[in-house]
């Protein structure tokens, strides 16, 4: 008796009835056996190798595969293993093509299964790592869902088709973690530190127009957020301002000079003078170059006004300058409020993400820079909305520098005060020590600022000079992604204008655990010190190897 598989197949007498054979598919479903499916798959491998019109050999291989069936049920994977075995016996090149095709099908199948599971979670807005991974993205909004869909699909594409296999496997196994896989195909940079002074002075272009130099603290703060928002679509990481106090100080001075001009012009007009406000503005800009002019500068300014025919006495001028100062402080506070509110509400990338923003400050000792820091800290404590919610952005970093914002003597003096409020009222040698105290108070209430210690040996720059008005160029600044970019193999050591490409994390806890296990197997005695030393050596060698691999 024979089993009729196809017109080409004649199986032996001991062959089971093929009509009784049941195929178990990968999803557990069952279906009747079909020899034609094996024939078709082998035929495609032959064609892919460039071998055509090989029907006889294909049918012979199919028959050999079927002869291996020993049970009435068999899995798809088992059949494919048999096909590979038989192909390797007669046509190794065809076998390679079959194996590659099989792997590709497995990859596609796995991708569809995993991606569907991920997509289902996004649709249902599950509280998982995917939907909660970005603090600056709302995954429950339609735009957020669309961005998450795109992100997960692109990660999968990058992992399967762009990354070299060894790195993809290391990432999947958890030996390393390659960040920002979703932006890997776009070839964009990750984070950057802006030189706002350069952008403000030269102006910059957005999609629909150019921006000129701002002329008030409100404009400075607003344009800073616009710069953040504009560049958000040019890269995929966070953005930072390395010297926020220095960059905003010019805006404070301009607002003060405008306030003096406005109040003084109004006062002179009330006294019956015919005032050309532009001329007054020029005089103010030339002589009042700080918001707290010294008695000598005030006297010179008063003399100039009298020479120009304006009868203003000393008390009247002091009143005008005090009014201008208070107006400037109020404007600066509103500018800092607006800055914080904008960075927590303005959506840019994909219409859904707020900017992942950071600002560094703390070392500008000018009256204007100090006012910026002071009002920023006040606005941070006040928080967002009517309930004073803690603002997530911008991430704030206060730069601590000995002799500028800290000294041991000042610290000891402050510790003698009853509380921090009393300590902040005192005077100190370090000009910004009172702001450091206020920053500590703000951190206790609003989580930010963080603190960066510039006197740590690896954070120092030999070019830093207290008398340099642009000393911020030589101060370390960090980005919200906790990235420290300072050293430079190809240029000047600075954080200004620097950024990074996306990074890879090494799984050091795993390396440490593995090193400990290996050490315990190598050292047979119970000498804990010897085991510890061997584990350290193995760990350091593993770190070196992994570093070379990355």
What residue ranges belong to the model's regions?
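Intrinsically disordered, low-complexity segments
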Residues: 1-4, 10, 260-263, 267
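Charged, amphipathic alpha-helical regulatory modules used
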Residues: 3, 8-122
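Conserved catalytic cores of very large enzyme subunits
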Residues: 108, 114-550
């Amino acid at each position: 008796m024979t089993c009729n598989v196809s017109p080409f197949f004649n199986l032996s007498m001991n062959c089971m009835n093929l009509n009784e054979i049941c195929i178990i598919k990968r999803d557990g479903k069952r279906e009747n056996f079909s020899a034609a499916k094996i024939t078709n798959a082998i035929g495609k491998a032959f064609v892919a190798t460039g071998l055509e019109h090989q029907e006889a050999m294909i049918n012979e291989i199919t028959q050999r595969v079927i002869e291996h069936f020993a049970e009435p049920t068999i899995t798809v994977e088992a059949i494919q293993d048999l096909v590979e075995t038989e192909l390797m016996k007669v046509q190794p090149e065809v076998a390679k093509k079959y194996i590659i095709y099989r792997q590709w099908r497995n990859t596609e199948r796995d991708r569809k299964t995993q991606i569907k599971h991920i997509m289902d979670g996004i649709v249902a807005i599950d509280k998982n790592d995917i939907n909660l991974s970005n603090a600056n993205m709302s995954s429950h909004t339609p735009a957020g869902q669309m961005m998450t869909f795109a992100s997960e699909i692109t990660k999968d594409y990058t992992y399967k088709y762009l990354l070299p296999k060894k790195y993809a496997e290391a990432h999947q196994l958890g030996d390393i973690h390659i960040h920002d896989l979703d932006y890997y195909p776009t070839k964009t940079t990750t984070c950057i530190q802006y030189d706002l002074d350069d952008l403000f002075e030269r102006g910059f272009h957005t999609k629909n127009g150019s921006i000129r130099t701002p002329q008030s603290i409100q404009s400075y703060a607003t344009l800073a957020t616009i710069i953040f928002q504009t560049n958000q679509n040019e890269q995929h990481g966070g953005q930072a301002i390395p010297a926020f106090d220095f960059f905003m100080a010019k805006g404070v001075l301009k607002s003060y000079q405008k306030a003096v001009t406005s109040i003084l012009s109004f006062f002179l007009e009330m006294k019956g003078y015919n005032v050309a406000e532009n001329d007054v503005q020029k005089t103010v800009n030339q002589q009042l170059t700080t918001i707290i002019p010294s008695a000598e500068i005030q006297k010179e300014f008063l003399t100039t006004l009298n020479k120009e025919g304006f009868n203003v006495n000393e008390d009247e001028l002091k009143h005008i300058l005090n009014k201008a100062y208070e107006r400037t402080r109020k404007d600066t506070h509103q500018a800092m409020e607006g800055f914080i509110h904008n960075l927590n509400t303005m959506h840019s990338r994909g219409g859904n993400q707020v900017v992942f923003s950071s600002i560094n400050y703390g070392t500008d000792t000018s009256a204007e820079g100090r006012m910026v820091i002071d009002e920023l800290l006040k606005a941070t404590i006040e928080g967002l909305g009517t309930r004073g919610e803690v603002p997530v952005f911008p991430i704030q970093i206060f730069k601590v520098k000995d002799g500028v914002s800290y000294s041991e003597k000042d610290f000891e003096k402050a510790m003698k005060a009853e509380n921090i409020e009393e300590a902040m009222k005192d005077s100190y040698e370090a000009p910004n020590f009172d702001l450091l105290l206020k920053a500590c108070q703000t951190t206790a209430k609003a989580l930010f600022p963080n603190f960066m210690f510039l006197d740590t040996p690896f954070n120092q720059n030999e070019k830093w000079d207290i008398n340099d008005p642009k000393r911020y160029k030589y101060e370390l600044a960090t980005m919200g992604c906790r990235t420290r970019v300072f050293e430079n193999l190809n240029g000047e050591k600075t954080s200004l204008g620097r950024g990074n490409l996306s990074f890879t994390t090494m799984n050091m806890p795993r390396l440490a655990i593995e090193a400990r296990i290996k050490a315990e197997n190598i050292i047979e005695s119970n000498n804990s010190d010897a085991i510890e030393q061997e584990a350290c050596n193995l760990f350091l060698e593993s770190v070196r190897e992994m570093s070379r691999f990355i």
